[in-house]
């Protein structure tokens, strides 16, 4: 750790350390808000690289991607420009869990993002390893020092170090210092953070082998085609690129696969005891799956292309830390892969992280003013989680550098806010992945209305320009007008059209109904209205969907909003000091144990305890109300 005065080679408003998905969003946000920004990366040729699965979106992750775009970020636009395949997951379920997922072209994605950051005003990109922080007399950030001794000044620094901080990759019992295969680990910064009193820990993740597509027999696999109708992450049509899509394929593990793994578990880094870092619960290695789900005869393995012009296939669901000599045998035990050629081995990577309870919800650290952290250093896993934190850290680093109030994203207004609230308030000791179940407000926090929730804020912050703002206003006006039309126009029982709709749907029309009434019926959608000539062809698909969802789910949405309002109203309600939570049978067992251990003072504090979900809070409020009424009744009797 260095102290001022220091001879700075150059001075900036904000320095971002790292150029992955978090670093790029942070640097772009800072620069676009008028701050002279430096983005420091270990490798200028690997900006926005996708070292694991080259994909964007999926359950909860797509909501984050839409939200970053709604604020003015890039990840959604990147996916829309470079996708190989797109599919909507959970399409048969409700809109709260609809999830767009795009397989992306790995090299194209990185090249397009590199071009964007290289041509961004106010943004300087430089290759180098930051190893130390420069602090002022009051322990405030003043800059950074690189491995070779060069110092750069800054009012704010954002750490987005990914898996590089103290990174070690493992294949079997062999290891080497690296942030990912073929790239240096970052050294020095962990020691600086420890010296400043920060707690750091170790986490692990992994990536599967890559296989030559020319050596795979797809006829033995199940094709996974793209959706015919392409959907988009970005709310900006200028980012939409119609392109030919590529299929993915599905194969499965076999008894031979399972036996190979069971016989050699002792050779894996975790089961062999070479490392003891926690890996991601929701993205386990294949050996973890075999151990944890021993009763399963087979596991799905998805075969996904990494690009249009490269032969590499990503073997999703098959990450491992087992020795390289075993990996080819394991791969060749999969149907369609009997003669496959392995181009890159799978490996596990262990790295340092900074538990995010040491951060404010602005992502500025509590110990050092002007120091922010975002992405995997905060204990998360996934490009989307990283990008979401990156744009928040970039916004707030810029605000801090400019002496303005920083922005806090409430959990009830976005998945992004839920993510950061969880990170900053819960003691998480394993890589955190965003899930729809983590949000108690998921019916309100949908992908389709991310712009409605966050674009006005993006405009206020300064990341949404006039063109995007005009697009947003037009869309919202069109949805509002269409909802009014649907609530006004009616179909009569005795009209030929009314009789046809009744016959087709098997549901009678009594006297007359509005078009909104029709939309509220199960399995009746806007496309059905359109088929009867009752739709509005001038609207975009997104505008039609927005109007339909608001009408069809209005009762559920209102109920959830009431729950939000109720919990908000009761946030400061004090909890009885002597309350024995273990006796409150309407609480889940996990909630009883956590509440009894933590002993929160208020309802608001209780909502932020890991393992206590919204249903538990509602049950607790009901319990307190019942106790209050019983107490009043007893007092009335005795008086």
UniProtKB/Swiss-Prot annotation:
* Chain sites annotated for binding NAD(+): 279-293
Q: What does this protein do?
A: NAD-binding protein involved in the addition of a carboxymethylaminomethyl (cmnm) group at the wobble position (U34) of certain tRNAs, forming tRNA-cmnm(5)s(2)U34.
Principal localization reads cytoplasm
Q: Which GO terms describe its cellular component?
A: cytoplasm
SUPFAM superfamilies in the cross-refs: FAD/NAD(P)-binding domain
GO terms in the biological process aspect are: tRNA methylation; tRNA wobble uridine modification
Q: Which PANTHER family does the annotation name?
A: GLUCOSE INHIBITED DIVISION PROTEIN A (PTHR11806), PROTEIN MTO1 HOMOLOG, MITOCHONDRIAL (PTHR11806:SF0)
Q: Is the Flavoprotein keyword given for this protein?
A: yes
Q: Which family does it belong to?
A: Belongs to the MnmG family.
Q: Which cofactor does it need?
A: FAD
The UniProt GO MF terms for this protein read: flavin adenine dinucleotide binding
What's the protein here called?
tRNA uridine 5-carboxymethylaminomethyl modification enzyme MnmG
Q: How does it assemble?
A: Homodimer. Heterotetramer of two MnmE and two MnmG subunits.
Where in the cell? Answer: Cytoplasm
Identify the keywords attached in UniProt to this record, alphabetized.
Answer: Cytoplasm, FAD, Flavoprotein, NAD, tRNA processing
The gene it comes from is mnmG
Q: Which residues bind FAD?
A: 18-23
Q: Which domain of life is it from?
A: Bacteria
């Amino acid at each position: 750790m260095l102290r001022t005065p220091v001879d700075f080679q150059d001075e900036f408003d904000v320095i971002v350390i790292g150029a992955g998905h978090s670093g790029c969003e942070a640097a772009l946000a800072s620069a676009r808000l008028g701050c002279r920004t430096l983005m420091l990366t270990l490798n200028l040729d690997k900006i926005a690289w996708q070292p694991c699965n080259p994909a964007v979106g999926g359950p909860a992750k797509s909501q984050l991607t839409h939200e970053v775009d709604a604020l003015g970020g890039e990840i959604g636009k990147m996916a829309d420009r470079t996708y190989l395949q797109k599919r909507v997951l959970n399409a048969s379920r409700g809109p709260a869990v609809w999830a767009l997922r795009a397989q992306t072209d790995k090299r194209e994605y990185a090249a397009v993002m590199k071009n964007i950051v290289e041509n961004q005003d106010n943004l300087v990109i430089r290759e180098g390893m930051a190893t130390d922080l420069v602090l002022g007399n009051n322990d405030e950030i003043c800059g950074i020092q690189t491995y070779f001794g060069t110092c750069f000044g800054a009012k704010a620094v954002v750490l987005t170090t990914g898996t590089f901080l103290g990174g070690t990759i493992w294949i079997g019992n062999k290891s080497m210092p690296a942030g990912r295969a073929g790239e240096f680990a970052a050294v020095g910064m962990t020691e600086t953070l420890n010296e400043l009193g920060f707690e750091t820990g170790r986490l692990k993740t992994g990536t599967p082998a890559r296989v030559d597509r020319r050596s795979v027999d797809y006829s033995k696999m199940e094709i996974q085609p793209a959706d015919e109708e392409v959907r988009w992450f970005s709310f900006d049509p200028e980012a939409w690129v119609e392109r030919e899509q590529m299929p993915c394929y599905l194969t499965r593990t076999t008894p031979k696969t399972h036996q190979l793994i069971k016989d050699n578990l002792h050779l894996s880094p975790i089961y062999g005891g070479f490392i003891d870092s926690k890996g991601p619960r929701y993205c386990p290695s294949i050996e973890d799956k075999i151990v944890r789900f021993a009763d399963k005869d087979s596991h799905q393995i998805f075969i996904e292309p990494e690009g249009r012009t490269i032969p590499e296939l990503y073997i999703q669901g098959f990450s491992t830390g087992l020795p390289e000599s075993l990996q080819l045998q394991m791969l060749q035990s999969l149907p369609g892969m009997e003669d496959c050629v392995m181009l890159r081995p799978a490996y596990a990577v262990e790295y340092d992280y900074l538990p995010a309870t040491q951060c404010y919800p602005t992502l500025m650290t509590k110990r050092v003013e002007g120091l922010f952290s975002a992405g995997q250093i905060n204990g998360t896993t996934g490009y989307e989680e990283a990008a979401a934190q990156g744009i928040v850290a970039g916004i707030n680093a810029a605000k801090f550098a400019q002496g303005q109030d920083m922005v806090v994203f409430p959990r009830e207004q976005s998945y992004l806010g839920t993510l950061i609230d969880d990170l900053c308030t819960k003691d998480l000791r394993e890589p955190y992945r965003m899930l729809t179940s983590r949000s108690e407000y998921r019916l309100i926090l949908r992908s389709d209305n991310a712009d409605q929730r966050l674009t006005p804020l993006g405009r206020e912050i300064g990341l949404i320009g006039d063109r995007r703002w005009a697009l947003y206003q037009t869309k919202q006006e069109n949805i509002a007008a269409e909802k009014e039309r649907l609530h006004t126009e009616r179909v009569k029982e005795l009209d030929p059209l009314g009789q046809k709709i009744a016959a087709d749907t098997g549901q009678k029309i009594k006297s007359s109904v509005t078009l909104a009434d029709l939309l509220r019926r199960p399995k009746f959608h806007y496309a059905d209205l359109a088929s009867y000539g009752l739709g509005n062809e001038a609207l975009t698909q997104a505008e039609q969907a927005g109007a339909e969802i608001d009408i069809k789910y209005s009762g559920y949405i209102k109920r959830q909003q009431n729950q939000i309002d109720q919990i908000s109203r009761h946030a400061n309600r004090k909890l009885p000091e002597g309350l024995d939570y273990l006796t409150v049978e309407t609480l889940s067992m996990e909630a009883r144990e956590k509440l009894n251990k933590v002993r929160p003072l208020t309802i608001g504090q209780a909502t932020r305890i890991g393992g206590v979900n919204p249903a538990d809070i509602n049950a607790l409020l009901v319990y307190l109300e019942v106790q209050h009424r019983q107490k009043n009744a007893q007092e009335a009797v005795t008086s």
